[in-house]
Regions:
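Short, structured segments at the rim of ligand-binding sites
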Residues: 1-264
Length: 264
């Protein structure tokens, strides 16, 4: 922009790491930009410069493999390798490695250089967490994964910072409540922006079929539940194309049997 730009942010900042990632990437290409205070971002007049740029793999997408490792770990089968991820990633959802560490998943990086893309190994260890408490204000896209995984591992939880989940691709709070109930878990959203599970169960559907609400993350967060519910059906599986179009193919490579409707 010839005259630059000043942005004034209002209200509570949600998903702050995405703003920080954008600023860092702009600076990589020569932008003169400053986050001056909590609510003001200044972009000065400055053309972008051209140079090569490595695009790291998606830590958000890796969350579903962490979930698989955690659920398979109870069968001593949880060993997964992911490629082209950085230990020092600027992606906010790279926090998934810390979240799942309390669920018994050890993350090992093949390279000791924090800014070097490398192979990541996930190894399941014993989990003795009595209750999972976490504020998702900076990583709301990971909430569905942790809700499903925590329930299936029988770990009560209290998750906060979820106020934006109601205005995502769908109302993810209502969607989670409805679909987890099909699997026999009763969630509590009586406090706005929070979701709890205190261990309350109900009778699961005999042959559960998960609705995805045109939401890619509903499909991918619930897919690993087939480890506990063999034959689990996922309706409208094509929704994964928004962020992870090869998700089902990658599950096949990992040994999961995927049967499409046309094959019934």
């Amino acid at each position: 922009m010839k005259k630059g730009l000043i942005l004034h942010l209002t209200g509570n900042i949600i998903s702050r790491p995405y703003i920080e990632l954008t600023i860092c990437t702009m600076k990589e290409f020569g932008a003169d930009i400053d986050w001056m205070d909590e609510s003001t971002i200044m972009v000065k007049p400055q053309p972008y410069s051209k140079h090569s740029f490595f695009v790291e793999n998606d830590w958000s997408a890796s969350s579903y493999w962490y979930e698989i490792a955690a659920l398979m770990g109870e069968k001593n089968e949880g060993h997964i390798r992911l490629t082209n991820l950085m230990e020092g990633s600027r992606q906010g959802d790279s926090a998934i490695k810390f979240m799942f560490s309390v669920l018994g998943i050890k993350t090992s990086f093949a390279s000791s250089e924090r800014q070097k893309p490398t192979t990541v190994s996930l190894n399941a260890q014993r989990c003795t967490l009595p209750t999972f408490n976490f504020d998702f204000i900076n990583q709301p896209d990971l909430a569905q994964t942790l809700v499903v995984c925590s329930c299936l591992k029988d770990i009560p939880f209290h998750f906060r910072g979820l106020q934006t989940l109601r205005i995502k691709e769908t109302d993810r709070i209502e969607a989670l409540k409805a679909e987890m109930k099909k699997l026999g878990y009763v969630l509590d959203d009586s406090i706005e922006g929070e979701l709890r599970w205190d261990g309350t169960r109900c009778e699961p559907d005999e042959s559960p079929a998960i609705d995805t609400y045109e939401d890619h993350r509903m499909a991918m967060a619930f897919a690993p539940a087939c480890i506990k519910f063999p034959g689990l059906r996922i309706n409208n599986p094509e929704v994964v194309s928004k962020s992870y179009p090869l998700f089902w193919e990658d599950l096949k490579k990992a040994g999961f049997e995927i049967i499409h409707n046309a094959d019934y």
